[in-house]
Swiss-Prot record:
Gene name, Swiss-Prot/TrEMBL: nadB
Subcellular location: Cytoplasm
Cofactors demanded by this protein: FAD
Residue sites binding FAD per the record: 17-20, 40, 48-55, 212, 364, 380-381
EC code: 1.4.3.16
Primary residence: cytoplasm
A GO biological process held by the record: 'de novo' NAD biosynthetic process from L-aspartate
Family, as annotated: Belongs to the FAD-dependent oxidoreductase 2 family. NadB subfamily.
SUPFAM superfamilies: FAD/NAD(P)-binding domain, Succinate dehydrogenase/fumarate reductase flavoprotein C-terminal domain, Succinate dehydrogenase/fumarate reductase flavoprotein, catalytic domain
Pathway where it operates: Cofactor biosynthesis; NAD(+) biosynthesis; iminoaspartate from L-aspartate (oxidase route): step 1/1
Keywords tagged on the record: Cytoplasm, FAD, Flavoprotein, Nucleotide-binding, Oxidoreductase, Pyridine nucleotide biosynthesis
Transmembrane residue ranges: none
Residues marked Important in orienting the L-aspartate substrate (site): E121
Organism: Mycobacterium bovis (strain ATCC BAA-935 / AF2122/97)
Name listed for the protein in its UniProt record: L-aspartate oxidase
Length: 527
């Protein structure tokens, strides 16, 4: 590369336009900093936030609930790997964050005028889930934040290729857009890139969930943790061998009384957990997987026929089912577990700060300590609002202290971008076969062999970068899964079916000297 095709500068650059990214950008803007928001997509609303159905877990001051109860439910779901202080900090700030969201224009469903309606989801001991549009909470959150961010500098079709730094602090970003590669100089960068669901052949995630932020963090030298804990949502709409993004069937349906049964009508979770169909997601998904293995059936069923007014309460699910030829009012809904959420990510504090000065992460890409080994339902939008807003404030404060001139002079043109990448279809098939809900040493080693066949590719566009990111993140997930020789939360090892108390520590992955490889620091405390 002879040099950048273009240059730009800002105080804060945010990568991502979901709940965490927009919350961060708005907070940084309110702090008086210049903000640039990047989206690799052509449309900014195509995010995991937009597709979120269930709601936001929040303790209301006038409800029969408490922050301590929400914290306890979160810790129980997290299977011993949550950071209790982080959990309390984020949960306790939830009501303030949701109130601010409503103040920005979000319209939540109400049980009576002036009182938010509440539902219950798996792992929660109380009805504490606020929602919008029945089962379109994410779409309403996305709409409200985008409307509020209408005056911000949001740029579509921009793919962040590398976080630039001087070894001590962030200096900017290398970005590719239709007119070529360029540099945005900035002292603060916030990664809010979402998840990694497209490691697998079928997922509830949108097309952009390709692990970009994890790869950017690894290349920047910061710690990534808990990547072996990939949550498979118990109820993804079954559609035969169809891959790509598949519709989610929200957990709130079970909260309103729907039951999970097999083809013979037998309960899936009876005798498995005291909370039955409302057990934490890892428990319910594992119970479904076990039943499918025992019966040889391709799916189980969510029977929601007893829910009065189903179509009006769950319009999104109703539309998805009817598009697939299923009437959920009259027929049980065929479901299977599907890749849904990364409980791990870039290690940050509860303000989104990473090890690298000026680099922040928020939302699904981050590991704050809230989720541990298994995320509690509807804690994701909560975390995005709370930590996204905090990260924006922190990034703005750092930018004010660092000053623009240092970042501008430090951001230099890098060498050509070339990494190794596996064919995406081959990678997804290998991950679905060997690193899905259940893992075994033989399969994980076979997966390592498959990943070692990745070929060098010059990164010149979004597709190239996504394939490179998926390959590096697949290596990271595989390495972490091999290192954890127990079953805990979302991570199940066939030859190690028990939870080992001595392994109640996080596994940290870092980028190796070779940018196409990773190394593992096994079982270290990162809380």
């Amino acid at each position: 590369m002879a040099g950048p095709a273009w240059r730009d500068a800002a105080d804060v650059v945010v990568i991502g336009t979901g709940v965490a990214g927009l919350a961060a950008a708005l907070a940084a803007d309110r702090a008086g900093r210049s903000v640039v928001v990047l989206s690799k997509a052509a449309q900014t609303h195509v995010t995991a936030t937009h597709y979120a159905q269930g709601g936001i877990a929040v303790v209301l001051p006038d409800n029969d609930d408490s922050v301590d109860a929400h914290v306890a439910d979160t810790l129980a779901a997290g299977a011993g790997l949550c950071d209790p202080d982080a959990v309390y900090s984020i949960v306790a700030d939830g009501y303030r964050a949701v109130t601010d969201l409503v103040g920005a224009g979000a319209r939540l469903d109400e049980s009576v005028p002036g009182r938010w309606a509440l539902t219950r989801e798996g792992g929660h001991s109380r009805r504490r889930i606020v929602h919008a549009g029945g089962d379109a909470t994410g779409a309403e959150v996305q709409r409200a934040l985008q409307d509020a961010a209408g005056m911000l500098d949001i740029r579509t079709g921009h793919v962040a290729l590398r976080v630039l730094h001087d070894g001590t602090a962030v200096t900017g970003l290398l970005v590719v857009r239709p007119d070529g590669c360029g540099i945005i100089s900035a002292p603060s960068v916030i990664l809010a890139t979402g998840g990694l669901g497209h490691l697998y052949s079928a997922t509830t995630n949108p097309a952009g969930s390709t692990g970009d932020g994890i790869a950017l963090g690894l290349w920047a030298g910061v710690a990534v943790s808990d990547l072996e804990f990939i949550q498979f949502h118990p109820t993804m709409l079954f559609a035969g061998r169809a891959g790509g993004r598949r519709p989610l069937i929200t957990e709130a349906i079970r909260g309103e009384g729907a039951i999970l049964v097999d083809r013979q009508g037998n309960s899936i979770t009876a005798g498995v957990h005291p909370m039955g169909d409302l057990a934490p997601r890892d428990v319910v998904a594992a119970a479904i997987d076990a039943r499918l293995k025992a019966t040889g059936d391709p799916c189980v069923y969510l029977d929601a026929r007893g829910i009065e007014g189903f179509a009006s309460r769950f319009p999104t699910v109703t539309a998805s089912c009817r598009a697939a030829g299923i009437d959920p009012v009259r027929q049980p809904i065929p479901v299977v577990p599907g890749a849904h959420y990364s409980c791990g990510g870039i290690v940050t504090d509860v303000y989104g700060q990473t090890e690298l000065l000026g680099l922040y992460a928020a939302g699904e890409v981050a590991r704050t300590g809230l989720h541990g080994a298994n995320r509690l339902a509807s804690n994701s939008l909560l975390e995005g609002l709370v930590v996204g807003g905090r990260a924006g404030k922190a990034a703005a404060a750092h930018a004010a202290a660092a000053g623009r001139s240092r970042a501008t002079s430090s951001a230099t043109w890098p060498e050509p971008i070339s990494y190794t990448a596996l064919d995406r279809g081959d990678l997804q098939r290998a991950m679905s076969r060997d690193a899905s809900m259940y893992r075994a040493a033989a399969g994980l080693h076979r997966l390592c062999d498959s990943l070692s066949g990745a070929q060098v590719r010059d990164v010149a566009c979004r597709r190239d970068f996504e394939d490179v990111a998926l390959t590096l993140v697949a290596q990271s997930v595989t390495a972490a899964a091999l290192a954890r020789t127990e079953s805990r939360g979302c991570h199940h090892r066939a030859e190690y079916p028990c939870t080992v108390p001595e392994q109640a520590r996080s596994i940290v992955v870092r980028g190796a000297d070779d940018a196409n490889a990773v190394c593992v620091q096994a079982l270290v405390a990162v809380c």
